[in-house]
């Protein structure tokens, strides 16, 4: 059984995934500065998503699980560093976008 069927783009300023099947865990390191924002958009057509964002020190700055509906949110960055975005899909179809936004 495939765990992921779709496309993925990831670098130090964004993670974008568009899929018909996402049934695994993926993560991406974003390099952020204080005052910037991580803008997230989730599209859930079926299945569920879990999202966690944490600093390089392991501090969790955002966490949500069992997400069944589409939505968006922003996470304000309070200190410079690497922020790891971890997304887990359970038989999910849809897309996720996490992008660095300045200001």
Each language-model region and where it sits:
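Surface-exposed coil/turn segments at beta-strand junctions on protein surfaces, enriched
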Residues: 10, 33, 44, 66-68, ...
């Amino acid at each position: 059984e495939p765990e992921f069927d779709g496309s993925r783009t990831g670098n130090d300023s964004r993670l974008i995934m568009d899929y018909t099947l996402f049934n695994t865990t993926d993560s991406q390191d974003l390099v952020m500065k204080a005052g910037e924002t991580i803008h997230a958009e989730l599209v859930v057509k079926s299945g569920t998503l879990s999202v966690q964002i944490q600093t390089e020190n392991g501090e969790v700055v955002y966490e949500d699980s069992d997400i069944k509906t589409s939505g968006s949110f922003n996470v304000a960055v309070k200190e410079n560093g690497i922020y790891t975005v971890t997304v887990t899909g359970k038989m999910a179809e849809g897309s996720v976008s996490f992008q660095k936004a300045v200001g």
